[in-house]
Amino acid sequence: MEKALLEIEEKARLARAASRPLSYASSAQKDAALKNIARCLLDNEPAILEANLKDQNEAKASGMLPAMLDRLIIDQSRLEGIAKDTFAIAALPDPVGEIFDMNTMPNGLIIGKKRVPLGVIAAIYESRPNVTVDIASLCLKAGNAVILRGGKETIHSNTILAKLIRQAVEQAGLPKEAVQFIENTDRNLVNHLLKLSDQIDLVIPRGGAGLISYVKQNSFIPVVAGGIGVVHVYVDADAKVTDAVNIAYNSKVQRPTVCNAMDTLLVHKDIAPVFLPAVAAEWSKAGVEIRADEAALKILENTFGCKLIPATPDDWGKEFLALIAAVKVVDSLDEALSHIARYGSGHTESIVTQNYTSSQRFLNEVDAAAVMVNASTRFTDGSQFGLGAELGISTQKMHARGPMGLKEITSYKWIVYGSGQIRG
């Protein structure tokens, strides 16, 4: 264990040393590194898929549920998508070096801010191997060194991806030490990593509630946490039924294992008799289990093919990460807002309505990172928000909120131009 701890410290030291030249590397050089990464992924598809298959087989042998298994799979299509996202990050404007908030003082001093990298970012994450590439690419683009620590369930995939990323970075003339990967999945090493505040500037955990809570409780380093999503869709009395069905279906079914999938459907009592049977009929085709309150049960009890069970108090405020939806009929917008305030996690909330006043109340009163009107909750995503990709979706308010892109992993320094001024 002592040797492993020393290796962690050495990786952090190397990342810190590499962060300095990376901080002032040219945009062209950083973009070249990202394009190299994307090409390396495509050129090494057989090796990546083989490594991922090992992860899949080990996950199946351990009894991992199919819904969770989907998170760690890389196939040809997903690999091409990862490469496409990496090219997209390369095409984004470089935030580093941006000059803003310039002002001339009465004494003639010109004072403003210049955007700079944070320095070294440690990413601790579970399941999804695409996170290895997304986070490394975003950190490099923003001039940050990165320390990657994935979960044991994707160790084979992450190992080869990190190796290829380091090769691609070095080919672009940047220090490969700017990307560090921790192969050892012992949790005690994470605890040690979280104490290296002299070498690491920010920790970003991505995963389940257990991981995020552990990192928050044990870190000596600032943490920006995301990923926990208890997500609601509220169908207002003035909703367009076809839109509401499509949004509720997409929010739940399109990819149920991710944090921006809907967990609870709130339905106004005036539209529930028409809307609920319609959405239940569509959900039944996808195998969605409905956990309904008493009012919803009465409406849906004769719906053919519907997987229907009574909701329990534990179903409200629960992130299902599966084809399960809690459904509640509410008397008013006020009741919907109160329910969301009590049970929401501050991730994403959506209202479906044709009533402008209701939509504005929802936007103003719901406290979440992303609040939507007449749109699927699945849009809360870095690529969908025009960020290229994301490091995570922060449900905090400091220092970043919602999908974290390039600007969210930079800081600024004050710059001052004088002409010989001295302070009296």
Curated annotation (Swiss-Prot):
It is found in: Cytoplasm. GO terms for biological process: L-proline biosynthetic process. Pathway: Amino-acid biosynthesis; L-proline biosynthesis; L-glutamate 5-semialdehyde from L-glutamate: step 2/2. Catalyzes the NADPH-dependent reduction of L-glutamate 5-phosphate into L-glutamate 5-semialdehyde and phosphate. The product spontaneously undergoes cyclization to form 1-pyrroline-5-carboxylate. GO terms for cellular component: cytoplasm. Pfam families: Aldedh. It comes from Dehalococcoides mccartyi (strain CBDB1). InterPro entries: Ald_DH/histidinol_DH, Ald_DH_C, Ald_DH_N, Aldehyde_DH_dom, G-glutamylP_reductase_CS, Glu-5-SA_DH, GPR_dom. This is Gamma-glutamyl phosphate reductase. Belongs to the gamma-glutamyl phosphate reductase family. HAMAP family: ProA. GO terms for molecular function: glutamate-5-semialdehyde dehydrogenase activity; NADP binding. Coiled coil: none annotated. Its main location: cytoplasm. Its EC number is 1.2.1.41. SUPFAM superfamilies: ALDH-like (SSF53720).
